[in-house]
């Protein structure tokens, strides 16, 4: 299964996918291209080091409509079967989302439907978790639709919020123990044909 991975920053989750493909933990999956939202994303260097083509498509430079067209054209040209948003801080355009319905997944660093939506990215969900005093947090892999963090939920994993946690320690633990576990799992489930969406709910087939 050919996938494209969209990134905006350091590419830690991208690296986890690269490593698990290399180790054989993820099978029958090939990263055809890494697409970054900006030229300064370190994820581009990770892609190059792994021999994966990388490209920058910037909504800021192109404008929303041209960005949507450029993204859709690029995905179609490389024959992508699944789009993976891994620390991608922009929103895909409506044409792209419609053309790849139930073929775009995102990793969110909280347990949707809590601490999600527009503006909830990076360190912010973890700050909000600690400010609210909740006792567990985690990560969610979900399909992408036209609204922020509202697509059908595929997988979730939780960790305890510790009394001495800071936003940074919580972010690091969730990334390692949740995000880098369930994002590769979701990719493998989709590659194996085990995910179906019925009435906007995800069912994992045995």
What are these regions (language model features)?
Residues 1-206:
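One-carbon transfer enzymes
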């Amino acid at each position: 299964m050919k996938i494209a991975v969209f990134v905006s920053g350091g590419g830690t989750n991208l690296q986890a996918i690269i490593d698990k493909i290399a180790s054989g933990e993820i099978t029958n999956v090939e990263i055809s291209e890494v697409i970054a939202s900006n030229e300064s994303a370190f994820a581009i260097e990770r892609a190059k080091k792994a021999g994966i083509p990388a490209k920058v498509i910037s909504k800021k430079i192109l404008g929303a409509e041209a960005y949507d067209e450029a993204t859709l054209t690029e995905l179609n040209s490389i024959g992508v079967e699944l789009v993976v948003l891994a620390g991608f801080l922009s929103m895909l355009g409506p044409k792209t989302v419609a053309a790849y319905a139930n073929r775009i997944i995102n990793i969110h660093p909280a347990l949707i439907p809590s601490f999600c939506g527009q503006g909830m990215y990076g360190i912010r969900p973890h700050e909000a978790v600690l400010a609210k005093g909740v006792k567990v947090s985690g990560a969610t892999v979900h399909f992408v639709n036209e609204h922020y963090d509202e697509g059908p939920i595929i997988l979730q994993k939780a960790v305890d919020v510790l009394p001495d946690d800071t936003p940074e320690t919580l972010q690091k633990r969730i990334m390692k123990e949740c995000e880098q576990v369930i994002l590769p799992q979701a990719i493998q489930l989709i590659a194996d044909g085990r995910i179906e969406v019925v009435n906007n709910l995800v069912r994992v087939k045995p």
